Amino acid sequence: MPVRFKGLSEYQRNFLWKKSYLSESYNPSVGQKYSWAGLRSDQLGITKEPGFISKRRVPYHDPQISKYLEWNGTVRKKDTLVPPEPQAFGTPKPQEAEQGEDANQEAVLSLEASRVPKRTRSHSADSRAEGVSDTVEKHQGVTRSHAPVSADVELRPSSKQPLSQSIDPRLDRHLRKKAGLAVVPTNNALRNSEYQRQFVWKTSKESAPVFASNQVFRNKSQIIPQFQGNTFTHETEYKRNFKGLTPVKEPKSREYLKGNSSLEMLTPVKKADEPLDLEVDMASEDSDQSVKKPASWRHQRLGKVNSEYRAKFLSPAQYFYKAGAWTRVKENLSNQVKELREKAESYRKRVQGTHFSRDHLNQIMSDSNCCWDVSSVTSSEGTVSSNIRALDLAGDLTNHRTPQKHPPTKLEERKVASGEQPLKNSTRRLEMPEPAASVRRKLAWDAEESTKEDTQEEPRAEEDGREERGQDKQTCAVELEKPDTQTPKADRLTEGSETSSVSSGKGGRLPTPRLRELGIQRTHHDLTTPAVGGAVLVSPSKVKPPGLEQRRRASSQDGLETLKKDITKKGKPRPMSLLTSPAAGMKTVDPLPLREDCEANVLRFADTLPVSKILDRQPSTPGQLPPCAPPYCHPSSRIQGRLRDPEFQHNMGKPRTNNLQLHPHDAFNDEDADRLSEISARSAVSSLRAFQTLARAQKRKENFWGKP
């Protein structure tokens, strides 16, 4: 709170020493200076004691000069001023009747004339100092013009002067401030604060007209103009660009809609010419609307109003970028809903395991099944050995289930001579219609079975005669004199077994009969491979040297010969166990004897051994190609021991020595030794483990989709 006391008392503020040329030469005495010293308060005109200092702001009146302080004597200019003698203060007595009303009227007039109008107390000392000088001058004027009681006639006409001339400007400013009107601030630099000195008053005088106190109330005079609002209409950019609802379009013919069936170009990025055209169109529409009578808006839709903003600015999902511009995609809900429903149904069927679609049916009934059944002539697996294919799970699974009683023929070299006939048969199948092809295919399976049985009976009869006569070469000659027409069938069967994996060589799904013929499929989830040997083997390389076939053939035949001698001493063999395929009807033999019937199977395969052995010993001629080795895997070439056994890659006992007996020209081949270590035989313990794993795999396959 600022300090308002600046060292000036109330007396010093109200009664200042008037300096003049007389005061310089005048040196008053002490009695003259303090002529009022020792007088009573009633003699000095003080009728009451001063009140306590209060913080409440009260109206302040300038001090009134009593009559006994007024100067009644003449003033001499050259002589010194003599203070007048104070007159005794006399109160009118109530007993005096002659002074009655006249004395009261004179007292009222004298008080009204001597009183200065009320003013508010200022807050700064500077304004108080300025106000003191003004009040002193006014008091002097009042005292000079004031006359004794007899001069009250001169005071009355002065009170009848017009208000606008006699009113004080400070009083007028106070009245306007109380009335709530705009008051122009005083331009006093001393009273301005730091904020007022830096920031000038922004309101102009025209916006806050100055009114007199008698013009506070509004009158009909033309001096004060009527208040007029701002005639300038503010138009925003939104109102200027978007005019609201578009007019209702007239119905158009279908021909017009067909002509404009192309994609509608509604892109947020407009060209430079489009705004000009848009303005011309909007101007023409405005002119048309001014002529026509504005029709009332019809409540056609109660939902979202199709405003101009919604029509021009759509979601980004409804556009696609094409040819350097964003083009609006036309809605085609029917096709989208149909596509989504088809996807949902396919997903549902895939989860439930019933996803047999028309595509699968077309694959089964199509003419291309012959291409899937018969492998390609240029198959890369043709150069792979039979024994390697017997252990290769991924590339040869059906080969172990096909009967092995017919004389073995070399597949790779036989394809070159008889490669034309399988192609002719495949072309015949392609020319047949779908139902005929399916029937013919089934008949072909039966025919193959019958011819295969015939070919199996012939070696049996020849083997019996050979045992009686002991002539091995005659049997070999009979086998070589067989017609070549049976070779394509055998080749076809072997090729089908070679490439009968889960997926065909050309890609696509194998037909259902073919998948059933394959039997149990092996995946990477199985710890062992029981159908072949239980060992986790790497896939063999597809490119083989030409001399590898003869080495595999010799090693397997030697092992079979020694095993035959041991088994024939035990007694009469048991009948063969057959695995019948429900689809193809083809009799197959279990290549891995897991039960007691292993002796019978091995004996039947051993009967065919001398024929193949003689064929191997014969010199190969350029016109006649040597036959292939039997794809059967002899027990001597199986892996012996467990997987973690240190002897896992090595054979033990007598079969091992026979297995390693090679021809003299191939005896010292490192690659052959590596290959033999990969295709090493397994023991009976491993066979039992493989059988248990196979049983678990079959049970898991049967219970995979749940029992019906």
From Swiss-Prot:
Motif, ST]-E-Y-X(3)-F motif 2: chain positions: 193-199
UniProt KW keywords: Coiled coil, Cytoplasm, Cytoskeleton, Microtubule, Nucleus, Phosphoprotein, Repeat
InterPro entries per record: MDM1
Sequence motif ST]-E-Y-X(3)-F motif 4, residues: 307-313
GO molecular function: microtubule binding
Record's compositionally biased regions (Basic and acidic residues): 123-140, 443-472, 479-495, 514-527
Single GO biological process annotation from the record: negative regulation of centriole replication
Record-level GO cellular component terms: centriole; centrosome; cytoplasm; microtubule; non-motile cilium; nucleus
Motif position, ST]-E-Y-X(3)-F motif 3: 236-242
One Pfam match: MDM1
Tissue expression as described in the entry: Widely expressed. Expressed at high levels in the testis.
Coiled-coil features, chain-numbered ranges: 322-355
Cellular location(s): Nucleus; Cytoplasm, Cytoskeleton, Microtubule organizing center, Centrosome; Cytoplasm, Cytoskeleton, Microtubule organizing center, Centrosome, Centriole
Disulphides: none
Modified residues (Phosphoserine): 124, 127, 284, 287, 315, 418, 555-556, 581
Chain positions covered by the region annotation Disordered: 79-166, 394-590
Superkingdom assignment: Eukaryota
Motif ST]-E-Y-X(3)-F motif 1 per record, residues: 9-15
Function comment: Microtubule-binding protein that negatively regulates centriole duplication. Binds to and stabilizes microtubules.
Protein family according to the UniProt entry: Belongs to the MDM1 family.
PANTHER family for the chain: NUCLEAR PROTEIN MDM1 (PTHR32078:SF1)
Protein name: Nuclear protein MDM1
Encoding gene per record: Mdm1
